[in-house]
């Protein structure tokens, strides 16, 4: 059983933006509600959803420091790190995983992987990681049309891999329109999602 109130108190020590805190709580509750539908442990889902943005308000230099410490543990492979170092914000999930180990003694690989990969996704990641990536994109407080479409796939169509694929389609399309860099993990993830969906 997860001690939800203590985890939320811990989250508030790291995040000061109330909208972001609300997003994390909403993601956690949404994941807990629908996890078992996709054969995912609901407690693991709650923790992943609640703490995925734990390091979002951390400075870039601290994100890099924490990320390097996490990589040294060799629990989860962090691909394209040299590239990501130029865009430290995308490593906030990796930094969050290191905080979770140090401060909360969370050492379950599946949870740590899901937090590491929630921003860009990745190739061949676990169902919990896939679910965290999707729910970060489509939790009920997300108020834009693509998120609502993915939400509907999760809630009404019961199709995890379709939701996963569409999350990438919307994410990559948005980056292309804005002429932003696409992290290679997202390309790997898209290809993996397409393969899973077409199985």
What are these regions (language model features)?
Residues 1-32, 189-192:
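Short, Lys/Arg-rich amphipathic segments at extreme N-termini
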């Amino acid at each position: 059983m997860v001690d939800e109130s203590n985890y939320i108190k811990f989250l508030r020590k790291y995040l000061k933006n109330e909208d972001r805190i609300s997003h994390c709580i909403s993601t956690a509750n949404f994941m807990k509600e629908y996890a078992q539908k996709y054969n995912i442990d609901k407690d693991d889902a709650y923790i992943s959803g609640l703490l995925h943005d734990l390091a979002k308000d951390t400075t870039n230099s601290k994100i890099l420091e924490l990320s390097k410490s996490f990589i040294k543990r060799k629990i989860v492979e962090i691909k394209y790190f040299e590239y990501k170092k130029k865009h430290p914000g995308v490593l906030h999930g990796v930094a969050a995983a290191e905080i979770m180990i140090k401060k909360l003694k969370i050492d379950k690989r599946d949870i740590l992987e899901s937090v590491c990969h929630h921003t860009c996704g990745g190739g061949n990641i676990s169902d919990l990681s896939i679910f965290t990536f999707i729910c970060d994109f489509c939790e009920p407080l997300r108020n834009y049309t693509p998120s609502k479409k993915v939400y509907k796939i999760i809630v009404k169509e019961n199709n995890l891999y379709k939701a996963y694929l569409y999350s990438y389609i919307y994410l990559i399309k948005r980056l292309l329109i804005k002429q932003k860099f696409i992290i290679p993990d997202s390309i790997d993830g898209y290809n993996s999602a397409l393969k899973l969906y077409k199985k």
